[in-house]
């Protein structure tokens, strides 16, 4: 509804880069944005931060008919999606990914979660967002390191999908917009077949068993994209050794 309130979740760096533009766009259409600040990266995926977000939504008078927007990388989308699923037993959420990693993978498929002391992503639900909107101009603000992290997830999807996507991720001068499109289409098809991650969708966890262990035992000093890259290499070497 054009008069609904919008909770905009993002960290300070993302807010400084993109927040003003998003708020201006919302206000021009008579929406009423209310920014809820988050810690950057994996640090936002805790019970404490989740509780603070839920309490802020209540204090600001948000209802089930209002909207939550998660602006940022995969961690922000994970946290924002779970908060939206829990508040009033479900308010609509839109993801505005700002990283390649979130654009090719994390923002697609409906998985939400926070971390527990026992491991990564142990508490969450699967609930699809109202929409995922990626502004390709965000690519211009990403470091080469951030692009490489996103490509780790894209390579994973390329291994599974094969065909054109595999060609794209092996191009020494990757066309990121096309890679994102192919990743999104493939993952959406997989999720449509197995939304609750019981069978076919499990393949999308390729490299993540090792990757998540690396993240956790490094205290999340090793970021998700780097951990997935290591996980993929580890599984590939193990498979070669086993003759697969």
Summary of predicted features, one role per range:
Residues 9, 37, 70-72, 95, ...:
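Short beta-strand segments
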Residues 71-73, 97, 223-227:
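Active-site nucleophile and cofactor-binding loops and adjacent substrate-binding regions
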Residues 17, 75-82, 103-104, 213:
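Short glycine/serine/threonine-rich phosphate/pyrophosphate-binding segments
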Residues 8, 46, 97, 135, ...:
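Residue-level signal for inorganic ion chemistry
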Residues 1-67:
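ATP/NTP phosphate-donor binding region
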Residues 79-90, 217-220, 237:
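Alpha-helix C-terminal capping segments
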Residues 167-244:
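Active-site segments that bind and position negatively charged phosphate/pyrophosphate groups
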Residues 81-171:
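A glycine/threonine-rich phosphate-anchoring loop and its flanking beta-alpha core
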């Amino acid at each position: 509804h054009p008069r609904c309130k919008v909770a905009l979740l993002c960290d300070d760096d993302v807010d400084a880069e993109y927040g003003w533009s998003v708020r201006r766009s919302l206000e021009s259409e008579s929406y009423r944005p209310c920014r809820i600040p988050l810690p950057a990266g994996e640090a936002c995926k805790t019970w404490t931060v989740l509780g603070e977000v839920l309490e802020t939504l209540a204090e600001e008078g948000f209802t089930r008919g209002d909207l939550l927007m998660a602006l940022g990388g995969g961690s922000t989308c994970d946290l924002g999606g779970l908060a939206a699923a829990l508040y009033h037993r479900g308010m609509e959420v839109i993801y505005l990914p700002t990283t390649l990693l979130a654009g090719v993978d994390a923002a697609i498929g409906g998985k939400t979660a926070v971390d527990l002391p026992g491991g990564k992503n142990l508490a969450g639900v699967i609930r699809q967002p109202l929409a995922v909107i990626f502004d390709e101009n965000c690519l211009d603000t990403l470091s080469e390191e951030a692009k490489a992290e996103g490509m780790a997830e894209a390579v994973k999807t390329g291994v599974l999908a094969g065909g054109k996507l595999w060609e794209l991720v092996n191009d020494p001068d990757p066309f990121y917009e096309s890679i994102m499109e192919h990743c999104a289409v493939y993952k959406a098809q997989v999720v449509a077949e197995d939304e609750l991650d019981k069978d076919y969708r499990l393949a999308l966890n390729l490299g993540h068993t090792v990757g998540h262990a690396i993240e956790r035992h490094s205290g999340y000093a090793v970021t998700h994209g780097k951990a997935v890259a290591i996980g993929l290499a580890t599984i590939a070497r193990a498979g070669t050794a086993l003759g697969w």
